[in-house]
From Swiss-Prot:
PANTHER family, per the entry: SERINE PROTEASE INHIBITOR, SERPIN (PTHR11461), SERPIN E3 (PTHR11461:SF129)
Gene this chain is encoded by: SERPINE3
Compositionally biased spans, kind Gly residues: 163-173
Recorded superkingdom: Eukaryota
Record's GO cellular component terms: extracellular space
Span of the signal peptide: 1-20
Lineage of the species this protein comes from: Eukaryota, Metazoa, Chordata, Craniata, Vertebrata
Organism: Homo sapiens (Human)
Family from the record: Belongs to the serpin family.
Biased composition range(s): Polar residues: 146-157
InterPro entries linked: Serpin_CS, Serpin_dom, Serpin_E3, Serpin_fam, Serpin_sf, Serpin_sf_1, Serpin_sf_2
Region of interest (Disordered), ranges: 143-174
Protein name: Serpin E3
Disulfide bonds: none
Length: 424
């Protein structure tokens, strides 16, 4: 039986920006990839919540490009929209990744990759050079026949600490525990993490229990954060005539922002908005916002889910990679036989603020007296985490329902402990 390649993408969250035509072109391509991934997941998830990290999915695919040849490499390039074999693209992405890790004024962002190699497996010197140069990567020997390898467990340890339970979290266990590694020769683990404090923090004393109308019309009482603040806001119309409000919530000491997209018509489902999202639309929204003083209401939420990326990539035309007879990954070791067995993406995201104590009476009085415009995410909405300097989308997610069991207090910050393992 030929050896196969297992790739894990271990996650948390992140983002980036640059200059000139190359920057603009790559920003659009990265955004198109993010939207393609989002729309593919949305199409099969119907009216449920989900969280994905486009940046975390694209990074390991880029590394695989260094070892892919022939139609295998072409299919990866078609899926990503670019190839790292283009020197301009390679240099641009390297410069972008070189800005990470970063830590300043309460914001922490880190991107890294580890390539665990079965002891005795020969690797192409050229592939080793590329991987070592790419996105803070490293090569480490490991016994991949043992899923509980010390090296891999160490790499996963930090993200496991924030694992939690809940109705929206999906199946338990991590992909590495669910995939046979008996014939694995390589394991690629990419980790991306983001933790940021709001530039203008939500006060726990302003958190209220307010109604949230779910996708199917069910109304739930949920903890709703609130603040009156200066924000970037805009109202737009998509190509089908649907109107949306777009709000930007920035993080302290960082260019990273959370963008929320809320249909103006309460009867417009997200499924009517999603097919009309394009990279140009996202660019217009994020660059055309204007300062406004608003009452902002945002629910606390937590999502964890797992996807089979293999089926999604197959639907995009990436098929050779998973076929032991067709996969051409000779650039990895110069040998035939490597192929990707599985591609599993697992992610978790939490948006929390300190305290759960409601202050409904005060809020009602505030709203009755205030003429300040209101942005109230009390129904299904789309949101994405983005670093405007490079336009890279770290998360692209959807909220359709807020579960009532969210009672944990973890301070007045937004935490994205993304545990994504894509097991190839």
């Amino acid at each position: 039986m030929p050896p196969f390649l297992i790739t894990l993408f271990l996650f948390h969250s992140c983002c980036l920006r640059a200059n000139g035509h190359l920057r603009e072109g790559m920003t659009l391509l990265k955004t198109e990839f993010a939207l393609h991934l989002y729309q593919s997941v949305a199409a099969c998830r119907n009216e449920t919540n989900f969280v994905i990290s486009p940046a975390g999915v694209s990074l390991p695919l880029e590394i695989l490009q260094f070892g892919a040849e022939g139609s295998t490499g072409q299919q990866l390039a078609d899926a990503l929209g670019y190839t790292v074999h283009d020197k301009r693209v390679k240099d641009f992405l390297h410069a972008v990744y070189a800005t990470l890790p970063t830590s300043s004024q309460g914001t922490e962002m880190e991107l890294a990759c580890s390539l665990f190699v079965q002891v005795g497996t020969p690797l192409s010197p050229c592939f080793v050079e590329h991987v070592s140069w790419w996105a803070n990567s490293s090569l480490e020997p490991a016994d991949l026949s043992e899923p509980n390898s010390t090296a891999i467990q160490t790499s996963e340890g930090a993200s496991r600490e924030t694992a939690g339970g809940g109705p929206s979290e999906g199946p338990g266990g991590w992909p590495w525990e669910q995939v046979s590694a008996a014939f694995a020769q390589l394991v690629l683990v990419s980790t991306m993490s983001f933790q940021g404090t709001w530039r203008k923090r939500f006060s726990s004393t302003d958190t209220q229990i307010l109604p949230f109308t779910c996708a199917y019309g069910l109304v739930l009482q949920v903890p709703m954060m609130h603040q009156t603040t200066e924000v970037n806001y805009g109202q737009f119309q998509d190509t089908a005539g649907h109107q949306v409000g777009v709000l930007e919530l920035p993080y302290l000491g960082s260019a990273v922002s959370l963008f929320l997209v809320l249909p103006r018509d309460k009867d417009t489902p997200l499924s009517h908005i999603e097919p009309h999202l394009t990279a140009s639309t996202i660019h217009l929204w994020t660059t055309s916002l204007r300062r406004a003083r608003m009452d902002v209401f945002l629910p606390r939420f937590r999502i964890q889910n797992q996807f089979n990326l293999k089926s999604i990539l197959n639907s995009w035309g990436v098929t050779d990679l998973f076929d032991p007879l067709k996969a051409n990954l000779k650039g990895i070791s110069g040998q035939d036989g490597f192929y990707v067995s599985e591609a599993i993406h697992k992610a978790k995201i939490e948006v929390l603020e300190e305290g759960t104590k409601a202050s409904g009476a005060t809020a009602l009085l505030l709203l009755k007296r205030s003429r300040i415009p209101i942005f109230k995410a009390d129904r299904p909405f789309i949101y994405f985490l983005r670093e405007p300097n490079t336009g890279i989308t770290v998360f692209f997610d959807r909220i359709q329902i807020i579960y009532q069991c969210l009672s944990s207090n973890k301070g007045s910050f937004v935490h994205y402990p993304l545990k994504n393992k894509h097991s190839f």
